A protein has these predicted regions:
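Long, ordered, helix-rich scaffold segments
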Residues: 1-170
Length: 170
């Protein structure tokens, strides 16, 4: 699938769907499918995320789905958010705050009372603010007031900026 051959993509999708495929192979194929970012891969991974019972596998699927820019990813995560265990919620917060549109959906869900403000980590709020979008900033201010990073956190963030930019390119 790295070459983008349609036959290879179809075979990878078939293997991920097959319950007899080993967990390790399924994990590797999920990663490859997310790298290709095809519509078929998105539909498969979203479907599996919505139906998966295993928490570890759901986190793998959320991580894979993060590579897609499609708004349906944020919508699917928010739909399951209330029923997620803590570890999944933390992963979901990281992912939802990583993209501007998903951040806006997430903070609107908080504003609507669907998600408790107290459950959102400060790092998540700061990540949402980093998008510098007025609608997000207004809701952050409404629910958390003025948040600022510590000097140490700013230093870590500035050191990580080149790596973050590189990750966004992939």
């Amino acid at each position: 699938t790295r070459l983008g051959l349609p036959e290879a993509m179809a075979e990878a999708i078939g293997l991920v769907k097959n319950t007899k495929t080993s967990a390790d192979e399924r994990r590797a194929l999920t990663k490859l499918l997310s790298e290709r970012r095809s519509t078929d891969a998105l539909e498969l991974l979203l479907g599996q995320f919505e139906e998966e019972k295993n928490s570890g596998r759901r986190i793998e699927l959320m991580t894979a789905l993060q590579r897609f820019k499609n708004n349906s990813v944020g919508t699917a995560m928010l739909a399951r958010y209330a029923g997620m265990p803590q570890r999944e919620r933390e992963s979901a917060q990281n992912i939802l705050s990583s993209r501007e549109n998903w951040s806006l959906e997430f903070i609107r869900a908080i504003d609507a009372g669907k998600i408790k403000r107290e459950d959102v980590r400060p790092a998540t709020v700061l990540a949402m603010q980093s998008h510098k979008r007025k609608a997000i900033d207004a809701l952050v201010k409404k629910h958390w007031g003025q948040l600022r990073q510590s000097t140490k956190a700013k230093q870590r963030h500035s050191q990580a900026k080149p790596w973050i930019a590189l990750a966004k390119l992939s």
